[in-house]
């Protein structure tokens, strides 16, 4: 399982479910839009602290960012 792709996919899905843009998450979290875009594409390897802060910005549990779902794209498991 590629954790970077899993986290990116989950982050993008949760962000969309909350109706937030990357710019809105940037304002809530302090992480740049460029960082968030790279994260969603699976190009970042966030620390545990970063996962926690991003989850807070989305209003979800940090566990939701690292848990595979039925919506996880094939190849990330």
Curated annotation (Swiss-Prot):
SMART domains: HTH_XRE. Residues 22-41 bind DNA. It holds the Pfam family HTH_3. Keywords: DNA-binding, Plasmid, Transcription, Transcription regulation. It comes from Sinorhizobium fredii (strain NBRC 101917 / NGR234). The keyword Transcription regulation applies. Residues 11-65 form the HTH cro/C1-type domain. InterPro entries: Bact_TransReg_Diox (IPR050807), Cro/C1-type_HTH (IPR001387), Lambda_DNA-bd_dom_sf (IPR010982). CDD domains: HTH_XRE. GO terms for cellular component: cytosol. It comes from the Bacteria. One of its GO terms (molecular function) is DNA binding. This is Uncharacterized HTH-type transcriptional regulator y4dJ.
